[in-house]
Amino acid sequence: MRKFLSLIAITFLMMSCSEDVKFNDPGLQGLKNDSFWRAADVRAYVTDGKLTIEAYAQYEVLTLGTSSTNLGKYKLGSTNSSNFASYATTFDDVAIEYATIPTPGPVSTVSLTNVGTGYTDATSVATTGGSGSGLSVNIKANANGGVTEVTLLSRGNGYMAGDIVTITGGNLNSKFRVVNVQNSNGEIEITQFDNVKMTISGKFKFNAVNSNNNPLSADVVNFQSGEFYNVQIYPSI
């Protein structure tokens, strides 16, 4: 009988834990530095077509922004300041702020801007240009000698979002743009926008750097597996 009661107690505890992590409707939650984080209140605003989501927990504010409400993915930490994430906490009058702002670092994501000519498939290809050094890539080229795919091999350091980098070899004319760097990157994905009920849903993940240079805070805050669901869009204020 005691074993049976213990089994019931364990089952009830497991159900309670499962219920605790079930997604709120509406709600916003994710993993902050590998620990579960959930907003106590969340709301969204649209101003001039740009989306802002504000999520509040005790002493904490998480803000997500995208350049539109269109479905799709929005890269963070790039030169497009309309796509951003920020996190702030204030406790005992000590303010700590993080943001996905352009900052020097190892390259995270690139976008090919010029395929160039004279290239062939190659590995460990050096690069030139940009703010940093040490960046090398693997490349694939088409029959005309144009680069069609760039894969990061060594991410280097000291690069900035927006840097234009040249791939060596070929006719030295294939280039790509640094979209963002590892310590300030991520994406927001809008998966659903209901313009009748005025609600929005999606996912997010990002690294954000210490933006107010507070020596008491870590250099980077990380959010992973983030989701927002049926967040109400309120009139802009």
What do the PLM-derived regions correspond to, one by one?
Residues 1-5:
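Bacterial N-terminal signal peptides that target proteins for export
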Residues 19-26, 45-50, 119-123, 160-161:
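A short, compositionally biased
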Residues 28, 45-104, 179-197, 209-211:
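Surface-exposed helix/loop patches within compact recognition domains
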Residues 62, 66-74, 82, 111-113, ...:
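Extracytoplasmic low-complexity repetitive segments enriched in small/polar residues
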